[in-house]
Regions:
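PTP/DSP superfamily signal
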Residues: 102-153, 161-173, 177-179, 183, ...
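Short loop/helix-cap segments at secondary-structure boundaries that form the rim of catalytic
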Residues: 44-52, 167, 182-191
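Flexible, polar/low-complexity N-terminal or interdomain linker segments that lie immediately upstream
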Residues: 1-47, 117, 121-166
């Protein structure tokens, strides 16, 4: 029998971020990246499900079957959801299905907290009726910015900053452009833009812009407006500003802020110069440098 330790609740924002990881292509195109299982009825699944989910099938006695054509032992994330399971103490479809999967899966099975109902209320644009995905269609799946503070703070790249649908879906009301190019196309329509003209080099001084960036983000988030921080690739410059903001607003030590952003976006990577500047910023905001940046982790 499986132990409950093999199941872990997964917040809607965590699944949203898993769905939106990308390198050159969406990570969803990697065969061993994500197995997303919908444990609801066939009728509910056909009506609408979370994008790329497959239906968990049952035998004639209503026992869940392992998904076919998925090598579960190799998959990095396995997420199971039903209509609205909200705790691991329930006995609904998501828990029953997860227990079957947990017998062969080597990591904890993630059970989506609040199920399809909560997820689709937050992220209506990730509802789908599509059942079969061709590999090329998944490769072309355009990822959305990563969510750092649910509904309020997003981290993205230039393409996402210029995508009208993304702005509308995430209700982006302000953005911070951390790159040398002032964007001419879409961001001129986003009236609230802060441009920080810095290039991704160890010699760039981003520290001198931290206060202005943090105050700008704070001002907009204070009115419950969503803010997108972006740079060309969304990996170094913009993630540095987001980490600086978490130190400023949440009073996180650099280590906590770093871990938070890394959990949301595992390929984020501020350059060495920016790491030193974040360490100075930690000292300015918190009055101490508690994070040892010589640690190879940074």
């Amino acid at each position: 029998d499986t132990d409950m330790a093999d199941l872990v609740l997964c917040k809607p924002t965590e699944l949203y971020n898993i769905l939106n990881q990308s390198t050159k292509f969406s990570r969803l195109a990697e065969p061993n990246y994500l197995c997303l299982l919908d444990a609801r009825s066939k009728r509910e699944y056909n009506e609408s499900h979370i994008v790329t989910a497959r239906r968990a099938k049952q035998d004639k006695d209503e026992n869940y079957l392992l998904p076919e054509s998925v090598e579960l032992e190799c998959v990095r994330y396995c997420v199971v959801y039903d209509g609205n399971t909200a705790s691991l103490n329930e006995t609904g479809p998501a828990i029953k299905c997860s227990r079957v999967v947990a017998q062969v899966y080597r990591y904890p099975v993630l059970v989506l907290e609040g199920g399809y109902e909560r997820f689709s209320a937050y992220y209506h644009f990730f509802r789908s009726q599509k059942v079969f995905w061709m590999p090329q269609e998944i490769e072309e799946f355009l990822s959305y910015p990563i969510e750092i503070i649910p509904g309020l703070l997003y981290l993205g790249d230039q393409r996402q900053a210029n995508d009208r649908h993304i702005h509308k879906d995430l209700k982006i009301n302000a953005q911070v452009n951390v790159s040398l190019d002032p964007e001419k196309n879409l961001s001129s329509e986003v009236h609230n833009e802060l441009h920080i003209p810095v290039m991704d080099s160890c010699d760039s001084d981003l520290l001198k812009f931290f206060s202005r960036a943090c105050e700008f983000i704070d001002k907009h988030m204070g009115t419950n407006s969503a803010v997108l921080v972006f740079s060309k690739l969304g990996i170094s410059c913009s993630s540095t500003v987001v980490i600086a903001y978490l130190i400023y607003c949440k009073k996180y030590f650099l280590k906590e802020a770093w871990t938070h952003v890394l959990t949301c976006k595992p390929n984020m990577r501020p350059n060495r110069g920016f790491v030193k500047q974040l360490s100075e910023w930690e000292n300015i905001i918190l009055g101490q440098q508690s994070t040892d940046i010589a640690d190879p982790h940074y």
